[in-house]
Amino acid sequence: MRKIALFPGSFDPMTNGHLNLIERSAKLFDEVIIGVFINTSKQTLFTPEEKKYLIEEATKEMPNVRVIMQETQLTVESAKSLGANFLIRGIRNVKDYEYEKDIAKMNQHLAPEIETVFLLAEEPYAHVSSSLLKEVLRFGGDVSDYLPPNIYHALKQKKNDWS
């Protein structure tokens, strides 16, 4: 059986922490599907199409990684429809673990054939979130160390558009 993993998220924007998880997942699984979830109730910086394109560019050297846009639904339902038998979740700290553990237990109840795999965030990304980076950038801080170059440039352009 092929090992297919879904890594779902809003990725607004995708960070080097996300990219690190994707690189590590690509070594563990036959295929990694990055699911850019479309949440119409959430205000995002990038459109789903922009996020998909930016992530594809950042992961283009990984042949077993593909990026899709996915309407918001139960993650396990997305995994089933894509043929994924694993879900990837990144854990930065104890708070993330407690939150993700409960979701993983519910997902296991809903779809016992799908296994959740937790990957611990590596330094220097363990403290980084997309929200934090957007906030730092908004006030003029340098976030270039935490973003893939193409995403950093796109984010800077968005910031210029805000001004």
Curated annotation (Swiss-Prot):
Pfam families per the UniProt record, alphabetical: CTP_transf_like (PF01467)
Residues annotated to bind substrate: 10, 42, 75, 89
Class of this enzyme: transferase
Site (Transition state stabilizer): 18
Cofactor(s) named in the record: Mg(2+)
E.C. numbers: 2.7.7.3
Record-linked InterPro entries: Cyt_trans-like, PPAT, Rossmann-like_a/b/a_fold
Catalytic reactions of this protein: (R)-4'-phosphopantetheine + ATP + H(+) = 3'-dephospho-CoA + diphosphate
Gene3D superfamilies in alphabetical order: HUPs
Associated pathway: Cofactor biosynthesis; coenzyme A biosynthesis; CoA from (R)-pantothenate: step 4/5
Single GO biological process annotation from the record: coenzyme A biosynthetic process
Residues that, per the record, bind ATP: 10, 18, 90-92, 100, 125-131
Localization annotation: Cytoplasm
Keyword field: ATP-binding, Coenzyme A biosynthesis, Cytoplasm, Magnesium, Nucleotide-binding, Nucleotidyltransferase, Transferase
GO CC terms, sorted: cytoplasm
GO molecular function, one term: ATP binding
Assembly, per entry: Homohexamer.
Family membership: Belongs to the bacterial CoaD family.
Role description: Reversibly transfers an adenylyl group from ATP to 4'-phosphopantetheine, yielding dephospho-CoA (dPCoA) and pyrophosphate.
Protein known as: Phosphopantetheine adenylyltransferase
Native organism: Enterococcus faecalis (strain ATCC 700802 / V583)
